Protein backbone atom coordinates (compact mmCIF):
# COMPACT_ATOMS: atom_id res chain seq x y z
CA UNK A 1 0.00 0.00 0.00
CA UNK A 2 1.44 3.44 -0.92
CA UNK A 3 2.57 5.70 1.88
CA UNK A 4 0.86 9.04 2.53
CA UNK A 5 3.81 10.76 0.87
CA UNK A 6 3.10 8.87 -2.37
CA UNK A 7 -0.66 9.48 -2.35
CA UNK A 8 -1.89 12.49 -4.32
CA UNK A 9 -3.26 15.26 -2.13
CA UNK A 10 -6.06 16.02 -4.60
CA UNK A 11 -8.78 14.21 -6.54
CA UNK A 12 -6.89 12.69 -9.47
CA UNK A 13 -10.05 12.16 -11.55
CA UNK A 14 -10.96 15.84 -11.29
CA UNK A 15 -7.35 16.85 -11.97
CA UNK A 16 -7.36 14.71 -15.11
CA UNK A 17 -10.69 16.15 -16.27
CA UNK A 18 -9.50 19.72 -15.75
CA UNK A 19 -6.15 19.06 -17.45
CA UNK A 20 -7.92 17.60 -20.48
CA UNK A 21 -10.24 20.61 -20.64
CA UNK A 22 -7.18 22.90 -20.48
CA UNK A 23 -5.55 21.01 -23.36
CA UNK A 24 -8.70 21.27 -25.47
CA UNK A 25 -9.20 24.96 -24.73
CA UNK A 26 -5.46 25.73 -25.12
CA UNK A 27 -5.66 28.70 -22.76
CA UNK A 28 -5.95 29.27 -19.00
CA UNK A 29 -9.18 28.22 -17.32
CA UNK A 30 -11.54 30.47 -15.37
CA UNK A 31 -14.40 30.02 -12.93
CA UNK A 32 -16.73 30.01 -15.94
CA UNK A 33 -14.90 26.95 -17.29
CA UNK A 34 -15.10 25.20 -13.92
CA UNK A 35 -18.82 25.97 -13.61
CA UNK A 36 -19.34 24.47 -17.07
CA UNK A 37 -17.40 21.33 -16.17
CA UNK A 38 -19.44 20.99 -12.97
CA UNK A 39 -22.71 21.19 -14.92
CA UNK A 40 -21.53 18.95 -17.75
CA UNK A 41 -20.30 16.20 -15.43
CA UNK A 42 -22.89 16.61 -12.64
CA UNK A 43 -20.20 17.51 -10.11
CA UNK A 44 -20.08 20.05 -7.33
CA UNK A 45 -18.15 23.20 -8.19
CA UNK A 46 -16.56 23.23 -4.74
CA UNK A 47 -15.05 19.77 -5.35
CA UNK A 48 -13.46 21.02 -8.56
CA UNK A 49 -12.20 24.18 -6.88
CA UNK A 50 -10.81 22.34 -3.86
CA UNK A 51 -8.82 20.22 -6.31
CA UNK A 52 -7.62 23.35 -8.11
CA UNK A 53 -6.49 24.95 -4.86
CA UNK A 54 -4.63 21.78 -3.86
CA UNK A 55 -2.98 21.58 -7.28
CA UNK A 56 -1.86 25.21 -6.91
CA UNK A 57 -0.67 24.70 -3.33
CA UNK A 58 1.49 21.79 -4.54
CA UNK A 59 2.68 23.82 -7.56
CA UNK A 60 1.15 21.49 -10.13
CA UNK A 61 -1.00 24.40 -11.34
CA UNK A 62 -0.83 28.14 -10.81
CA UNK A 63 -3.42 30.81 -10.21
CA UNK A 64 -3.14 34.30 -11.72
CA UNK A 65 -5.34 37.15 -10.58
CA UNK A 66 -7.49 39.18 -12.98
CA UNK A 67 -4.45 41.40 -13.69
CA UNK A 68 -2.41 38.38 -14.76
CA UNK A 69 -0.12 38.34 -11.70
CA UNK A 70 0.77 34.92 -10.35
CA UNK A 71 -0.72 34.53 -6.87
CA UNK A 72 0.72 31.83 -4.66
CA UNK A 73 -1.93 29.89 -2.79
CA UNK A 74 -1.36 28.04 0.46
CA UNK A 75 -3.25 25.71 2.76
CA UNK A 76 -4.12 28.64 5.03
CA UNK A 77 -5.97 30.34 2.15
CA UNK A 78 -7.97 27.19 1.45
CA UNK A 79 -8.69 26.58 5.14
CA UNK A 80 -9.94 30.16 5.48
CA UNK A 81 -12.47 29.54 2.72
CA UNK A 82 -13.73 26.39 4.39
CA UNK A 83 -15.24 28.10 7.43
CA UNK A 84 -18.69 26.94 6.29
CA UNK A 85 -17.43 23.45 5.30
CA UNK A 86 -18.04 23.97 1.55
CA UNK A 87 -16.70 26.49 -0.93
CA UNK A 88 -19.54 28.74 -2.08
CA UNK A 89 -19.89 30.99 -5.11
CA UNK A 90 -19.37 33.94 -2.74
CA UNK A 91 -16.12 32.41 -1.46
CA UNK A 92 -14.86 31.96 -4.99
CA UNK A 93 -15.73 35.46 -6.28
CA UNK A 94 -12.30 36.72 -5.17
CA UNK A 95 -10.67 34.17 -7.49
CA UNK A 96 -11.82 35.67 -10.78
CA UNK A 97 -8.47 35.21 -12.48
CA UNK A 98 -7.17 32.20 -14.38
CA UNK A 99 -5.69 28.79 -13.71
CA UNK A 100 -3.11 26.89 -15.73
CA UNK A 101 -0.58 24.10 -15.21
CA UNK A 102 2.56 25.25 -13.38
CA UNK A 103 5.68 25.79 -15.45
What is the role of each PLM region?
Residues 1-103:
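Long, charge-rich, low-complexity intrinsically disordered regions
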Amino acid sequence: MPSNEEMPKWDVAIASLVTEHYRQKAEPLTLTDFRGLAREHAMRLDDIMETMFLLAIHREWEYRDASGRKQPLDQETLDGLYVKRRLSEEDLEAFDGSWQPGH
